[in-house]
Amino acid sequence: MWAQAARVQFRAPLDRGRSFASKVGPRGKVQAADPKTQAPRLVPEGTDRVSAAVVEHLERLALVNFSSREAVDRLEKAVAFADQLHAVDTDGVEPLESVLEDRCLYLRSDKVAEGGCAEELLQNSNHVVEEYFVAPPGNIPLPDMVGKVPSSTAE
């Protein structure tokens, strides 16, 4: 009982975060969002092709190279599959804050444990510098090296 009351109290601040699909007021009434606030479509209405500008933009954001026609075709198929969600009738469906909102989830107790196990934990890492984990570089765009001759630095 108290968990349900606590969940209701925490719902109100979360309503501010919804902006694309619907607007939920403090009483839970769903209103359609303004079409101007909808996310832009990758594929224009009535076509099944992704424009070159969108492909270039996605390449910069995701650091993925769509140089082959096969990659662009796969992207277009993925967008067409995702566009099927627009056909789903969601009238009368209450928006979810979490898929687990019908369950009472309990937190574990916060117990202080003995420390001093840094050496043991650092043994799990491939690369350590001054008692810190070193992560590999993420998606860093590298210059295109095709056709370039490496310059010699020793003269």
Curated annotation (Swiss-Prot):
Annotated GO CC locations: glutamyl-tRNA(Gln) amidotransferase complex; mitochondrion
Keywords carried by this UniProt record: ATP-binding, Ligase, Mitochondrion, Nucleotide-binding, Protein biosynthesis, Transit peptide
Compartments it resides in: Mitochondrion
Main location: mitochondrion
E.C. designation(s): 6.3.5.-
Annotated transit peptide: 1-20
Regions that span the bilayer: none
The keyword Transmembrane appears for this protein: no
Source organism superkingdom: Eukaryota
A biological process from GO: regulation of translational fidelity
GO molecular function: ATP binding; glutaminyl-tRNA synthase (glutamine-hydrolyzing) activity
Region (Disordered): 19-42
Reaction catalysed by this enzyme: L-glutamyl-tRNA(Gln) + L-glutamine + ATP + H2O = L-glutaminyl-tRNA(Gln) + L-glutamate + ADP + phosphate + H(+)
NCBIfam families: gatC
Protein role: Allows the formation of correctly charged Gln-tRNA(Gln) through the transamidation of misacylated Glu-tRNA(Gln) in the mitochondria. The reaction takes place in the presence of glutamine and ATP through an activated gamma-phospho-Glu-tRNA(Gln).
Similarity field: Belongs to the GatC family.
Record-linked PANTHER family: GLUTAMYL-TRNA(GLN) AMIDOTRANSFERASE SUBUNIT C, MITOCHONDRIAL (PTHR15004:SF0)
HAMAP family according to UniProt: GatC
Subunit structure: Subunit of the heterotrimeric GatCAB amidotransferase (AdT) complex, composed of A (QRSL1), B (GATB) and C (GATC) subunits.
Descriptive protein name: Glutamyl-tRNA(Gln) amidotransferase subunit C, mitochondrial
Organism, scientific name: Rattus norvegicus (Rat)
